[in-house]
Each structure stands twice: as C-alpha cells, then as structure tokens.
Regions:
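Phosphate-group recognition and catalysis centered on beta-loop-alpha active-site segments
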Residues: 1-236
Length: 236
C-alpha cells in the first residue's frame, strides 16, 4: 500500500512534523467575529430548489461556481450547469442574515479583476452585503483585492491524497507561504486534513468540509474549538 493511502484512511491523521517548517505567529492574529450565528452550514447547495428547501434551516450555504467570461455570468456547479447565481439568490426576496460560501473554481491571474467586478455588481442587484459572501480559492494570491473590497475570503488547503510522499513537504511549504503572504480571512479544507491544518496553521480561523459518514461523531469535537468558524455538513 502506498504511504499516502495509509495516511489518508483516517479523518484525524498525524501530521508530518517537518522540523524546519514553522508556522508564523501572525497566523493567530486573523481572528474576529464574522457575524456567524451558527457554525454549521449546508454543503453542496447547487440548485434553487435545494436552497429554498433549506433556507430557514441553516445560516450558510456552500455553492460551487464557475465564472463564464464570455457571458460574464456565474454559473452554479462545476461547469456544465445553466443555473446562475442570480437564479439562486432569487429564491427569496430577503437574503439578509444568510451567508454563502462560493467555491469559485476558476479564479486566475487573468480573470480575477473581472470576477471581482461582477461579484460586486451581483451583490448590488440582489441587495446583499459583500461580507456575507465567502470567496474560496486555492489561489490565495488572487484573493487580496476581494478582501479589500469587503468580501470574506478563504484559502483552500491543498488536497494531499494523490501527492507523492516525497512532495508533501514542498506542497505544505508552498501552502504556508501562500497564507502568510495573503490577507485571506480563513483557511478551509476537508476535515480529513484536520491535523495538518491544525499543526501548520495554528490559530488561523478555519472552515471544514465534513461530508463523510463520521460527521455526527466528529462535529462535537471540531465545533467547540475556538479556531473553527464553519463546518459544512451534507443534508441529513
């Protein structure tokens, strides 16, 4: 069995403690009240029907988003859907008090400014606070302008499942540097990477995706931690 297969089988894995990779103290400074009444948000809300059904049950919802440059539109899903973010936000006339985790799949150097401009326009059309949208990307370096404009921002922890063991150190070093050099509000990742995130990003506000069968067992431990801001759960 590959070493990584052994590492990834459990949700709470022991981190690889590289002695010369030390998290900076300033990571613990990015804390504060983000106005979340509940830490439990709903995962995979990629249809207006699902949002409408659960609107009164949760304070926050995760939506997968792809920006289409040709149509200057945010499409919901992973690229093949026709539902737009405007369609999603039209399900209720009043979105105040609700938060949306936007997992934007294609932010890059070339389109970051256009995506920011269109997101600002979207919040205006739908009468939403920019601080109620969490823009998520593995490219923390492209999120600073979003943060400066009033959006909440989140750096996605890299997936390690298919990374060769000899390359894990390099991947984690790069992740730490990206976080240190950015102004993002959170770091997020699958709960299976809990120990890695806890060890390398101590004190950083965290968001977790907890979509496995063990959710009920893991939630009580994670939710009571002061550095846990949000846990995404699947619909029961």
């Amino acid at each position: 069995m590959h070493m990584n297969d052994k590492l990834m089988r459990g949700y709470f894995m022991a981190p690889l403690k590289f002695k010369d990779l030390v998290a900076e103290d300033n990571m613990s400074e990015r804390e504060g009240s983000f106005g979340f009444k509940s830490k439990i948000w709903l995962y995979g809300v990629n249809s207006p029907e699902k949002l409408a059904k659960n609107f009164n049950k949760y304070d926050g919802f995760e939506i997968d988003v792809v920006y289409n440059e040709k149509e200057r539109t945010f499409f919901v899903g992973r690229g093949s859907g026709k539902v737009t973010l405007d369609d999603m936000f039209a399900v209720k006339p009043d979105l105040s008090g609700k938060f949306f985790w936007l997992d934007v799949k294609n932010i890059d150097f070339n389109n970051q400014s256009e995506i920011l401009r269109e997101l600002i326009a979207l919040t205006g059309r739908n009468i939403m606070h920019k601080s109620h949208l969490v823009v998520v990307s593995p490219n923390a370096e492209y999120l600073d302008d979003f943060a400066a404009s009033g959006f909440l921002t989140c750096f996605r922890f890299p997936s390690l499942y298919r990374v060769k063991r000899g390359d894990i150190r390099k991947v984690l070093e790069a992740a730490v540097e990206k976080y240190k050099n950015s102004t993002v509000d959170f770091i997020c990742g699958d709960v299976r990477y809990f120990n890695f995130m806890d060890f390398y990003f101590p004190g950083a506000p965290k968001m977790y995706q907890n979509t496995g069968r063990e959710a009920k067992n893991i939630n009580p431990y994670i939710l009571k931690r002061s550095d846990t801001s949000v846990v995404l759960n699947q619909e029961p």
